[in-house]
Amino acid sequence: MKLALLGYGKMGQGIAALATAKGHTITAQINSKNTLQQQLEQALQADVWLEFSTPDTALNHIRTAIKHQKPIVVGTTGWYAHLNELRQEVVKFNATVFYARNFSLGVHLFFKLNQSLAKAMQNHPPVVRLDPPWRHG
């Protein structure tokens, strides 16, 4: 698969190493010195864009992906105030945007643990805790 990496910090570099080890090709590596506008031609050769930059930059990257109908996976947080307007653009351009509010392994493990715990506890009676009111004086 051909990938464009939009944001080449720790996460972008880690993805690049993993992707190339699995036989994928990186068509563009976007960072503060090599912008998407400068490498747009290379980025458009990718099958999918992976976005791990900054909130302001991510918004521009997402809009560019939508405009060019490039599927984009967004790991950057902090741009959600624009989510509703981006949804309208996705519909207008028939684009694909996948985002997650947190790509942290620890957070995903926590959610999985909670799901497992909820499943294990579903056949047990509910737990109720009653605290007596505090009396001062």
Q: What role is predicted for each listed range?
A:
Residues 2-15:
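Glycine-rich adenosine-cofactor-binding loop
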Residues 14, 18-39:
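NAD(P)-binding Rossmann-fold cofactor-contacting core
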Residues 26, 72-73, 96-97:
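Hydrophobic beta-strand scaffold residues
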Residues 40-44, 48, 52-76, 83-86:
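Rossmann-fold NAD(P) dinucleotide-binding segment
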Residues 63, 76-100, 105-117:
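Rossmann-fold NAD(P)-binding glycine/threonine-rich loop
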Residues 109-137:
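Conserved anion/nucleotide-ligand pocket segment
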